[in-house]
Amino acid sequence: MHRSLSLRAVVCLSTLLPASLLYAAPDVDIETLKQELLELKQRYEAQQKALAVLEQRVRQVEDQPATPAPKRLAKSPADFKQSGSTVAASSGTGGATGGSSYGQSLKDDSEPAQSVSNLYNEASGFFGNGKFSFETGITYARYDARQLTLNGFLALDSIFLGNINLDRIKADNWTLDLTGRYNLDNRWQFDVNVPVVYRESTYQSGGASGGDPQATSEESVSRDPTIGDVNFGIAYKFLDESATMPDAVVSVRVKAPTGKEPFGIKLVRSTANDNLYVPESLPTGNGVWSITPGLSLVKTFDPAVLFGSVSYTHNLEDSFDDISSDVNQKVGGKVRLGDSFQFGVGVAFALNERMSMSFSVSDLIQRKSKLKPDGGGWQSIVSSDANAGYFNVGMTIAASENLTIVPNLAIGMTDDAPDFTFSLKFPYYF
């Protein structure tokens, strides 16, 4: 009896246990799902906060004005025109917001850097930055020449018998240039230039101390600051640069003989050396009227700017009361200075928005001058022809929107050219 009851109890318990387990399992799964759902909600809230922060940053960026693209430094006028047409097309076809900001960016980019404008001014000689401009410039030129004089003959084609004399001339020239310019409609330019010249020359020669070839003597002559030859010019810009054509300017310059002419200046013999003759004064001008037509071209090949110029100077014939250099002698006559031809080519680069640098070579070729004493015929002046070649290194520095600093170094490459010439100009635009 007891065994049957125990068996029945075991059977009942075995049937009830799986049912209790089945009811307990869903409770555990629900708790797990609730925990996972809570974690997902927390992640969602964190993501929502992150999205809100990102959205706020995007709005701040959109509210800021668009930053224009960097300016091209060596941009030609042809590019300016193309940029202008692109701006018009963008504003006409673009959207209300994106099109206007993009067009404004192109408009800002179409404006040339100030260094490029200064570069064009110096290369073409046409200053179009303002209606009026005034330029102050200082120029220093150094000239040092030696001449070997042989008085004797060669023996056995290799031995020189006689006297050897070495002559030397050292000259320092300072010029203060005052130039005023007027620009009319960025097409015509009128200018006048007034130079103030200071000169000092030192002459050396052997044969001092009674003709001793080993002894040398020297004499110095100076000229106080004096106005030189005033000149004025007219320039016309007849061609604007395009994709295929350069910027072209034609000019005419007239020089008046307002300085001290070199004719009639007497050569005085040195008291210490019979071989040395020095002028009693120094000239500050040519003494004759001259006219110089010229042409200058400028073309952009980004990032470089190529430029070139050519000019021809014709000196007018004139008469003087005295053309002799002998002391106590006065001879009137006519003077015909030799005409000159000058050309130059170079390349320039814009270093940044305020500075540019240029390199160029130039050459001046002058014909011989002639004199005609009263009652005589025309006579050519010995060694009056010249060939002066230069290598030029220049810069433009935009000190402000109105003031530019232009240093330039010219190195003489031929015997007729000064050893070097350094100039510093300060054009100011009103």
UniProtKB/Swiss-Prot annotation:
Quaternary organization: Homotrimer.
Protein name: Functional amyloid transporter FapF
InterPro entries: Autotransporte_beta_dom_sf
N-terminal signal peptide: 1-24
Membrane protein topology class: Multi-pass membrane protein
GO BP annotations listed: protein transport
Site (Forms salt bridge with Lys-425): 122
Key word Repeat present: no
Disordered, as annotated region: 62-114, 203-223
Subcellular location: Cell outer membrane
Coiled-coil region: 29-64
Gene source species: Pseudomonas fluorescens
